[in-house]
């Protein structure tokens, strides 16, 4: 008889999944989406929920159903060099290049920046704040102890309670009717796809491939061995966490939209969140928000530094040890953090436009692999075609100066002429399907059932 999780065990796994993906930094994207989407907010929310909630859940399920022992093992189904490249690229993205620096800049933007005089000294204040932030993060990454358990078990629930109070107050005292708020930017013409791409910024689908094995291993440790049962248990346990995440995203997004009655659309969601807290709850509300966000982001940064250092010390056993990697990643994160929150979000976009198609394709292949025996041929053709299209998406999302320097306008015109959905930022879909079709045809023609 197949072992099944009890209700208590489902609750435990669900709380783990929620803790894995939910971070204070994630809130800056739905609130910004809400301000930008205006009256088109519901279409935008749907797109956000697909990439910000649905894909992470599928990513964890993919690790379970494919019997993979982590990201490197899963991507090795293409080949080992690709696995090394993809694993390093993904961990650097959710690590020292973007996600870890974002922890510091989000804390600074939501908190200290709001009370500083606007006299041009913010660059110095950000440097001092981020230096202290990463000194603390490195300290705890090298000496994990009970403080992190306290932060996780006590602070996160307190943060959710405060967030709940803020959202309830904002929703019960709307500053504007949703129908009266004018959509801005791409949200005026294609809100669903703009929301879909905004979900990339959460990086949760990437995180699901990197850290999902932790949840899968917990389910296995609870006695569930059958791959289908592991995946099923992951999905069922994830329903609760996904619904909670979706509820938070929707509530915060609507609060962002309604705030447009008294606030202009902010440059980034960190500023918007702070302004909303100050408007509805005053200076005390802003202080509480800043304190809880800072500590929650610190916990996230410690976890990411630890995971990245462990991964790189395992990938390069003859290279630096864990302690050295942790120091390197902390210093690199400090450097990138001082670009500022808006710059980090802007510079991360091309990388996310490159990594997300590859991640989505890998998740789909892992989930559907039983239908073609996880044949390496299918993996190689699918990822190969996706890789080409992902490079195109990366080029299109580059900063304007770089984009123009590499003849970006000509490349963009070519793609929009020959790649369906390229103008929506989804030009990778058709190449991915073509690559998968070629791989499947070759697989079934040769009767090749070789396992990757």
Predicted regions span which residues?
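Hydrophobic, membrane-embedded alpha-helices of multi-pass small-molecule transporters
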Residues: 11-22, 92, 169-176, 185-252, ...
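Selective recognition of specific alpha-helical transmembrane segments in multi-pass small-molecule
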Residues: 54, 58, 158-171, 234-260, ...
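Membrane-water interface regions at transmembrane-helix termini and the short interhelical loops
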Residues: 65-69, 73, 132-155, 221-224, ...
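TM-loop-TM module centered on a large, flexible mid-protein loop between adjacent transmembrane helices
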Residues: 70-76, 248-298, 305, 314, ...
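Hydrophobic alpha-helical segments and their helix-loop junctions in multi-pass secondary transporters
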Residues: 96, 100, 160-187, 205-206, ...
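Membrane-interface loop-to-helix entry segments
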Residues: 141-170, 349-360, 379-389
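Hydrophobic, small-residue-rich membrane helices and short re-entrant helix-turn-helix hairpins
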Residues: 143-154, 192-195, 215-244, 262-274, ...
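A generic transmembrane alpha-helix motif of multi-pass inner-membrane proteins
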Residues: 173, 184, 375-452
């Amino acid at each position: 008889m197949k072992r099944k999780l009890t209700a208590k065990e489902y609750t435990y796994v669900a709380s783990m999944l929620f803790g894995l993906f939910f971070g204070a930094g994630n809130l800056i994207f739905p609130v910004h989406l809400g301000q930008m989407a205006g009256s088109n907010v519901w279409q935008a929310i749907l797109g956000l929920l697909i990439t910000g909630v649905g894909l992470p859940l599928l990513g964890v399920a993919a690790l379970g159903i494919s019997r993979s022992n982590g990201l490197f093992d899963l991507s090795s189904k293409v080949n080992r060099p690709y696995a090394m490249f993809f694993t390093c690229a993904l961990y650097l993205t959710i690590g020292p290049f973007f996600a870890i620096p974002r922890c510091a800049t989000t804390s600074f933007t939501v908190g200290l920046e709001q009370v500083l005089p606007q006299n041009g000294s913010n660059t110095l204040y950000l440097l001092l704040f981020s230096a202290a932030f990463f000194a603390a993060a490195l300290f705890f990454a090298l000496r994990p102890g009970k403080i992190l358990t306290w932060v996780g078990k006590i602070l996160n629930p307190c943060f959710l309670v405060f967030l709940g109070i803020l959202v309830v107050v904002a929703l019960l005292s709307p500053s504007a009717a949703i129908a009266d708020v004018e959509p801005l930017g791409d949200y005026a013409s294609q809100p669903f796809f703009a929301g879909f791409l905004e979900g990339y910024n959460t990086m949760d689908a990437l995180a699901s491939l990197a850290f999902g094995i932790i949840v899968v291993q917990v389910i296995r440790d609870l006695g569930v061995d059958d791959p289908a049962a592991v995946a099923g248990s992951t999905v069922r346990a994830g329903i609760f966490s996904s619904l909670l995440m979706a509820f938070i995203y929707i509530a915060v997004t609507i609060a962002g939209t309604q705030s447009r009655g008294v606030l202009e659309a902010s440059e980034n969601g960190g500023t918007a969140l702070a302004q909303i807290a100050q408007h509805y709850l005053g200076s005390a509300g802003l202080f509480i928000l800043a304190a809880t966000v800072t500590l929650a982001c610190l916990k996230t940064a410690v976890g990411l530094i630890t995971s990245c250092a462990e991964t790189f010390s395992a990938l390069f056993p003859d290279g630096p040890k864990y302690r050295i990697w942790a120091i390197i990643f902390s210093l690199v994160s400090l450097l990138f953090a001082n670009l500022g929150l808006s710059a980090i979000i802007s510079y991360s976009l091309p990388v996310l436009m490159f990594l997300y198609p590859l991640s989505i394709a890998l998740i789909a292949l892992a989930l559907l692999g039983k239908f073609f025996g996880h044949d390496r041929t299918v993996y190689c053709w699918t990822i190969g075609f996706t890789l080409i299209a992902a490079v195109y998406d990366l080029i299109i999302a580059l900063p304007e100066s770089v984009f123009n320097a590499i003849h970006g306008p000509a490349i963009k015109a070519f793609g929009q002429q020959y790649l369906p959905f390229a103008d929506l930022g989804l030009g990778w879909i058709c190449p991915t399907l073509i690559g998968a079709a070629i791989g499947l045809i070759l697989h079934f023609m040769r009767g090749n059932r070789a396992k990757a």
